[in-house]
A protein has these predicted regions:
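Structural microenvironment flanking redox-active thiols in thiol-disulfide oxidoreductases
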Residues: 63-69
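Conserved Rossmann-like nucleotide-binding pocket used by diverse enzymes
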Residues: 11, 31, 57-59
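Conserved helix-turn-beta segment immediately C-terminal to the redox Cys motif
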Residues: 23-25, 42-61
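Conserved redox-active cysteine motifs that mediate thiol-disulfide chemistry
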Residues: 30-44
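Short, Lys/Arg-enriched N-terminal segments with co-localized hydrophobic residues
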Residues: 1-5
Length: 110
């Protein structure tokens, strides 16, 4: 759908290429369809993916379908949002936070 930019869907198969090898900051929302609080974070992530298009990579990992990297990075509660730079975790937010918390995490790396 034109004009409707969605956050990138990241899978175990694409995680390394999309997240770890990115030359831009990457924000990853680990979520699941059954998770109520995830539905509060989702729209924020979608907005930020539009706002920071071209400057940062912003995506989502469905932990029910993609457990490898959730386990590797110790994601035990969702929503968990991790911020990566140069393949390393540089930020972590567990649970729901205000929009500015996520925006500032990206801004600080630009």
């Amino acid at each position: 759908i034109k004009g409707n930019i969605m956050a990138l869907e990241i899978t175990d198969a694409t995680f390394e290429e999309t997240v770890l090898k990115s030359d831009k900051p990457v924000m990853v929302d680990f979520w699941a369809a059954w998770c109520g609080p995830c539905r509060m974070v989702g729209p924020i992530i979608e907005q930020l993916s539009t706002e920071y298009e071209g400057k940062a990579v912003i995506g989502k990992v469905d932990v029910d379908a993609n457990q490898e990297f959730a386990a590797k990075y110790g994601v035990r509660n969702i929503p968990t949002v991790l911020v990566f730079q140069n393949g390393e975790v540089v930020g972590r937010q567990v649970g729901v936070a205000p929009r500015n918390v996520y925006a500032e995490a990206i801004e600080s790396l630009l």
